[in-house]
Curated annotation (Swiss-Prot):
One of its GO terms (biological process) is L-cysteine catabolic process to pyruvate. Keywords: Amino-acid biosynthesis, Lyase, Methionine biosynthesis, Pyridoxal phosphate. It comes from Rhizobium johnstonii (strain DSM 114642 / LMG 32736 / 3841) (Rhizobium leguminosarum bv. viciae). It catalyses: L,L-cystathionine + H2O = L-homocysteine + pyruvate + NH4(+); an S-substituted L-cysteine + H2O = a thiol + pyruvate + NH4(+). This is Putative cystathionine beta-lyase.
């Protein structure tokens, strides 16, 4: 397998996704790893039990199934180790709890995922951690926000719902000069299109619920760390007793095999629709980093290899008093798009993004923000469905 591992390092992404994670000959040649259903692990003797020298000691600390997924993620991320947790949000909260303490100051991008903000404003505040939000366009200017007690920077690129890009290498360089750890939610791009650890990030976070699963049927998160921060992350996870289930790990590993192909379709279809939306009278503007018209497009072009299937547009409105009514009319007229909060699955989804919680990066004021998750349906059918939405909104 070592010869194969060496070959895979320089192979294309779909070849790597097909083969990473486990050696079939570790399991008598079976192409997929076993799903181990056991919480208890037996020891051969009292000495082994006392020293815990064997590889597996208890179900929460790993199984052959969960290890196969962790090894696959490490191969994709270039990380020293990965933990599995029950959801994408848990993948955010665990490193926070592992790397900050009472009296610390943390910097969090203002375009952050809403539930992450809620965690920061409630749980971290109760624990005595001060959170300050920064503008996603700040780049190296983040230096002015650092204090002697700043211990962590949490980034998310692109931003949630409005998709602002960040200068991740510049932010990471500043943070490291001040001795702060940098973590990033990279769910949008996945390691297929962006590898955070290659750009200075210490801890990479993914909601595997999204593209790694691809079928809207699994909840799971992964957190991957570089060598400097791996032991502390692993300790935090063990102390908190949070782990991913073997069945879920198996399904995510299964999803990885086709993730590259699915992402190609999501990327191609979403960008096609985003370009089609630009310049329409129904649309005030399109928020997609891969569009040359997008303000931080240059950062996407510099750092990312592609884009996923989720973006937003601002629905044209005659004034703020009609904004919500137009958004609801648009959404209620859709028949192929479902109305749902998640993304990364095979099906297209839409929602009205509420951005009133932002404190630094103000939300668009020229109309309601409609977020689209573009699935794998035929683009012509999705465009026809969007036309139905526009017709309904124009009648308001």
């Amino acid at each position: 397998m070592k010869d194969k591992d060496s070959l895979l390092q320089n192979a294309g992404i779909n070849t790597r996704l097909t083969h990473i994670g486990n050696d079939p000959f570790d399991y008598h040649g079976f192409i997929n790893p076993p799903v181990v259903h056991a919480s208890t692990v037996l020891f051969p003797n009292a000495r082994a039990m006392e020293t815990r020298t064997q590889k597996y000691t208890y179900g929460t600390r790993g199984t052959p199934t969960t290890d196969a997924l962790c090894e696959a993620i490490d191969a994709l991320e270039g990380s020293a180790g990965t933990i599995l947790v029950p959801s994408g949000l848990a993948a955010v909260t665990i490193p926070f709890l592992g790397f900050v303490a009472a009296g610390d100051h943390a910097l969090v991008v203002d375009s952050v995922y809403g539930p992450t903000r809620h965690f920061c404003d409630t749980m971290l505040k109760r624990l005595g951690v001060e959170v300050e939000y920064y503008h996603p366009e700040i780049g190296a200017g983040i230096e002015t926000l650092f204090r002697s007690n700043t211990k962590l920077v949490h980034t998310e690129a692109p931003g949630s719902n409005t998709f602002e890009m960040q200068d991740i290498p510049a932010i990471s360089a500043v943070a490291h000069r001040h001795g702060a750890v940098v973590m990033m939610d990279n769910t949008w791009a996945t390691p297929v299109y962006f590898r955070p650890l290659d750009h200075g990030v210490d801890i990479s976070i993914h909601a595997s619920t999204k593209y790694p699963s691809g079928h809207s049927d699994i909840l799971l998160g992964t957190v991957s760390a570089n060598a400097e921060h791996w032991e502390r992350l692993k300790e935090a996870n063990g102390v908190l007793g949070i782990c991913g289930a073997p069945d879920d790990a198996y399904q995510i590993l299964r999803g990885l095999r086709t993730m590259g192909l699915r992402l190609e379709r999501h990327y191609e279809s979403a960008l096609d629709i985003a370009k089609w939306l630009e310049g329409r009278d129904d649309v005030a503007r399109v928020l997609h980093p891969a569009l040359p018209s997008f303000p931080s497009h240059h950062l996407w072009k510099r750092d990312f290899k592609g884009a996923s299937g989720i973006f937003s547009f601002v629905l044209a409105a005659d004034g703020p008093e009609k904004s919500r009514a137009k958004a609801h009319a648009f959404l209620d007229a859709l028949r192929i798009f479902g109305l749902g909060y998640s993304w990364g699955g095979f099906e297209s989804l839409a929602l009205h993004a509420y951005l009133n919680d932002r404190t630094v990066a103000k939300a668009p004021t020229d109309g309601p923000v409609i977020r689209l998750q573009i699935g794998i349906e035929d683009v012509a059918d999705l465009k026809a469905d969007i036309e139905r939405g526009f017709a309904a909104a124009s009648a308001v």
